[in-house]
Amino acid sequence: MAKRQLNRRQNWRIEKIQGERAARAAKRESSAVEALEGGDLGPEQTGLVIAHFGVQVEVEALEGELAGSVSRCHLRANLPALVTGDKVVWRAGNQGIGVIVAQLPRTTELRRPDSRGQLKPVAANVDMIVIVFAPLPEPHANLIDRYLVAAEHAGIRPLLLLNKFDLIDEQNAPALNALLAVYRTLGYPVLEVSAHHGNGMEQLQQQLDGRISVFVGQSGVGKSSLVNSLLPEVDTRVGPLSELSGQGTHTTTTARLFHFPGGGELIDSPGIREFGLGHVSRSDVEAGFIEFNDLIGTCRFRDCKHDREPGCALLKALEDGRVQQQRMNSYRSIIASLPESSY
């Protein structure tokens, strides 16, 4: 059944109610912080945000007597929005509730637009973005390329991970092999694993060790199953594929950070079906297609749109086979999705 469209007044009323609720929650949180700071708080120490729950976060102590322990913390009102992976300065309270007093600088930040088009960080200090896809639901190069552009734009190393490779058969093998060949030719690291059978999981663990990684990909590709295989002691609920859409049902409800025994961390985030790139410019997208690097700026016309213009270096490379048609299609699709202000 089609979703009911809301008129302007209904949208305004919903936003007004949500704003009032947020204001009341912020006031309650401010009162709680004041009460804590009025009592006995421990010394300032560094911590790592491992989960976010509305106006509170879970912080793992990184030093001192509490090192390794986890505390629920309030946030001071003057702090920016925190996300999983943030390093912070916090103070412990007497009753297991602490207060975050400062955010430490981020080395990297993974952001995406929310439902209103506003940029929101989803993970911080990430070293590697693992782009997960599977034979089912059918992988789309355009979505993979959007993740790659986001990774290049954020300065985060990407890893392409084909999960459920045991589901490859005579029907889907040609398309999957062709898809993987494109990225291997470009030099992107590609792994094929099966979280269900365990194949390739040791090689994946080697890639994850020593890094802070985040798994991204549409629902149903097995991100939660991968976490369960890598960290058997963690109970991440797994939802079945929808019989109607072939896409997975959302299971993980909040980004959470897990430690691997051999070193390194994983941030498991909710499935993302469409990764928006409204915050990037045309030049950012061009830079995200690494095979374009030596071609951009060599077209006959400075304002070349790489469409049908004579003397276009990208079109010549496409004709020569140095640029794959699949990648050019993705590039054009991403460019077409950008707001005009990004041009």
Swiss-Prot record:
One of its GO terms (cellular component) is cytoplasm. Its cofactor is Zn(2+). InterPro entries: G_CP_dom, NA-bd_OB-fold, P-loop_NTPase, Ribosome_biogen_GTPase_RsgA, RsgA_GTPase_dom. Keywords: Cytoplasm, GTP-binding, Hydrolase, Metal-binding, Nucleotide-binding, Ribosome biogenesis, RNA-binding, rRNA-binding, Zinc. PROSITE patterns: ENGC_GTPASE, G_CP. Pfam families: RsgA_GTPase (PF03193). Zn(2+) binds at C299, C304, H306, C312. Belongs to the TRAFAC class YlqF/YawG GTPase family. RsgA subfamily. NCBIfam families: PRK12288.1, ribosome small subunit-dependent GTPase A. This is Small ribosomal subunit biogenesis GTPase RsgA. The gene is rsgA.
